[in-house]
Regions:
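Terminal targeting segments of Actinobacterial cell-envelope proteins
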Residues: 1-39
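Boundary/entry segment of secreted carbohydrate-active catalytic domains
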Residues: 25, 29-31, 48-49, 53-115
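Sec-dependent N-terminal signal peptides
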Residues: 38-52
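Functionally critical loop-and-helix segments that line ligand-binding/catalytic clefts
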Residues: 68-101, 221-277
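Substrate-binding cleft of extracellular glycoside hydrolase catalytic domains
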Residues: 81-104, 110-203
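Short, solvent-exposed loop/turn segments at secondary-structure junctions
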Residues: 178, 212-213, 233
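Aromatic-lined carbohydrate-recognition surfaces of secreted/lumenal glycan-active proteins
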Residues: 202-215
Length: 277
């Protein structure tokens, strides 16, 4: 039980200070993570793909119209129970020279945008190479809750729509920082961004975050497929946070590059993406 403060002003000031400190630590961690990813990629030279899950060959079959969207979570739960995992990577401009043609990945998700004006310099190249390879591809936006969510969503869509689209392309919100906003504000921001992209595209976007962040700020987002980072869990063994009943993608390591497994097959992943080009 929480003790009552003797000073009525102490508790709100302490809470504000704690939130500010937490946000600064989150931002610092994000910057350190990005720097370490670049260093690890340079040192490693090539991505270590030994021990990755093998999956069926991707067919690239065209999909149905947006109205015929497949149920999202039952296939996920079935795949998890069956133990089937599909291996994939996520890439940004910190790995600008990554060679997709020599990759064992069955899906690739790449950074497109951040905030209201940043465009990843390597997005177009990665997007084109993934299209040529023919595996499932997706694009993600790194969100900043201090900004207008609709403005950020529109920035993401404008960059995404500047490139050729294919059926099965995945859309993702990457949310890892609060920018000093409250839990309810961050949660509302995410709901607005996701709903806007869904309305504009007919695609239910995926939500990405670390497990702890998603568990705190992700309540009420269970309609959006979950991509969760949890490095202390073996690949495919993570439990869903907040009120998600299942996960769709588990990012299980960031060494020497971000590596993931999906509980879905490649074709099932495509069902979550664009239904038409």
């Amino acid at each position: 039980m929480e003790a009552r403060s003797q000073c009525p002003m102490l508790k709100p000031r302490l809470a504000a200070f704690t939130q500010t400190l937490t946000d600064r630590l989150d931002l610092l961690k994000h910057r350190i993570d990005l720097s370490s990813k670049r260093l690890r990629f340079v040192v490693a030279g090539t991505v270590l793909l030994a021990g990755t899950a093998s999956v069926a060959t991707v067919t690239g079959t065209a999909l149905a119209a947006p109205a015929a969207h497949a149920p999202e979570h039952p296939p996920v739960q079935e795949a998890q129970q069956a133990g089937a995992l599909t291996y994939g990577l996520d890439i940004s401009n910190y790995e600008p020279l990554y060679d997709w043609s020599d990759s064992q990945a069955q899906f690739g998700i790449i950074k497109a945008t951040e905030g209201t004006d940043f465009r990843d310099a390597s997005f177009a190249r990665h997007w084109h190479e993934l299209g040529q390879k023919g595996i499932v591809r997706g694009a993600y936006h790194y969100g900043h809750p201090a900004n207008d969510p609709v403005a950020e969503a529109e920035h993401f869509l404008s960059v995404l729509n500047s490139q050729p689209a294919k059926p099965g392309d995945l859309l993702v919100l990457d949310l890892e920082t609060t920018d000093g906003q409250s839990v309810s504000a961050v949660n509302s921001w995410a709901k607005t961004w996701l709903a806007h992209v869904k309305e504009r595209t007919g695609v239910t976007p995926m939500f990405y975050s670390g497990w702890n962040f998603a568990n705190t700020y992700g309540h009420g987002l269970a309609e959006y497929p979950l991509w969760v980072a949890h490095y202390s869990k073996d690949k495919g063994t993570v439990s869903p946070p907040a009120d998600w009943k299942s996960w769709t993608i588990h990012q299980y390591t960031d060494y020497p590059i971000d590596q993931n497994v999906s509980a879905l097959s490649a074709d099932q992943l495509r069902d979550l993406g664009r239904q038409t080009a």
